[in-house]
């Protein structure tokens, strides 16, 4: 049986502001981020989502630095933290849990759909009951999986981002108003 550990995103990718470059650790080229014979959904739900998270994490750091130095930057809002830019008027939603996961999900999913260019993704052998879209979300959630200390795996960040993302509800047929498809949703873009 495999072990589940929480992954610190800062250990997987780094953004160098001086060089304007993002570096991703070689370990990211293994599951759950990258599957050598995976589908397009697995590529974008894994490595694509990781890269998008890295970029949004870096943007928030840049916004905080800009705020601290009182410079104007196109990514800084009045507080300097992009997590506040997640448009969410729901008091029960922890906006800190949504950032950078919700904007990264929005970007990775848009890239996935663009890569498909209107075609259907391949079905996974042994998991034919899942559409490519569902595999995208399953892979994304797998990258966020952590152990709760009692031996159970869970993903609060996955749940927080997925419940606010309409394509997730559509892919899994979540009933409107249910816990994974609230009528009012938060968004970044």
Predicted regions, residues:
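Zinc-dependent metallohydrolase catalytic domains
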Residues: 1-51, 55-189
